[in-house]
């Protein structure tokens, strides 16, 4: 079984330090992103950086189903959430009200909780080489979490000595994500219209937190997780050369680093 390597040399695939806690950057602070941010504020050591990015402002329609109060209306979501979590957990929480495309992303694990193709493309365009991106998306009562960090041309090789150092970016694993249009309604409005389960965002947030925890601890064997609330199932796709080969049409032998002597 392969496990995702957090820290490694992008040229040699030599693991440098797979036992450290990186910064985590959450892009999108609405439904799922709000639950993820709260969980990370508890999960991460206080000395480690937590950054929230969202240029949207809090509206009254967000109050019932997202992590905001009436006092937050008119504030940027990232600002309101960062200040609340900093006070709640007694830790620094940084935030940005600029779009991802306004500059390079900080180093660390990127958690994408956005709901449209252009936002995902912006994340992909501004990742550092080998920077892990955990993408979360959901429908009415189902969702997926995808993990990746590399374009196709960077995948040879990707696996070495039981570790997975590179996986295709989420938008390569599921190109249809780029075709997803921007939502006209918020998660709260979707719930009110019975177009979205009232618990799907919490469920997706919990899955994302488990993935982040396992990547940091060096125990994450997955590259995809699929949740179906109606069926009561959670289906993983393991991070293996065979799966990556099927997705990319790269030969398995090209994905595995030969043993060094």
Predicted regions and their residues:
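Glycine-rich phosphate-binding loop and adjoining beta1-alpha1-beta2 segment
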Residues: 49-89
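Conserved active-site and cofactor/substrate-binding residues in soluble primary-metabolism enzymes
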Residues: 35, 73-76, 80, 200-207
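Glycine-rich phosphate/adenylate-binding loop
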Residues: 1-8, 14-26, 30, 105-107, ...
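Active-site catalytic pocket residues across diverse enzymes, especially alpha/beta-hydrolases
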Residues: 40-44, 67, 127, 216
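A structured beta-alpha segment of the ubiquitous adenosine-cofactor-binding alpha/beta core
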Residues: 75-108, 114-119
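Glycine-rich adenosine-cofactor-binding loop
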Residues: 20-44, 51-59
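Hydrophobic/aromatic beta-strand patches that form the interior of the parallel beta-sheet core
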Residues: 51-53, 96, 111, 132-134
């Amino acid at each position: 079984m392969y496990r995702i390597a957090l820290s490694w040399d992008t040229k040699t695939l030599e693991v440098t330090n797979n036992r450290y806690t990186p910064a985590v950057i959450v892009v999108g602070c609405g439904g799922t992103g709000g639950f993820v941010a709260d969980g990370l504020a508890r999960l991460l050591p206080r000395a480690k950086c937590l950054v929230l990015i969202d240029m949207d402002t809090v509206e009254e329609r967000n109050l019932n189903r997202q992590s905001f109060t009436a006092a937050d209306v008119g504030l940027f979501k990232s600002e309101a959430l960062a200040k609340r979590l900093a006070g709640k957990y007694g830790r620094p929480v940084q935030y940005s009200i600029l779009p991802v495309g306004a500059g390079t992303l900080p180093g660390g694990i990127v958690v994408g909780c956005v709901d449209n193709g252009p936002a995902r493309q912006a994340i992909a365009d501004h990742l550092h080489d080998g920077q892990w991106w955990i993408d979360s998306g959901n429908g009415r009562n189902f969702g997926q979490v995808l993990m990746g960090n590399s374009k196709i041309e960077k995948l040879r090789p990707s696996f070495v000595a039981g570790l997975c150092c590179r996986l295709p970016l989420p938008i390569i694993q599921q190109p249809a994500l780029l075709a997803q249009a921007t939502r006209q309604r918020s998660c709260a409005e979707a719930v009110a219209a019975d177009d979205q389960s009232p618990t799907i965002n919490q469920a997706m947030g919990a899955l994302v937190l488990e993935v982040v925890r396992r990547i940091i601890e060096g125990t994450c064997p997955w590259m995809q997780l699929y949740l179906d609330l109606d069926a009561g199932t959670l289906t993983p796709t393991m991070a293996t050369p065979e799966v990556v080969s099927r997705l990319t049409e790269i030969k398995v032998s090209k994905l595995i680093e030969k043993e060094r002597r």
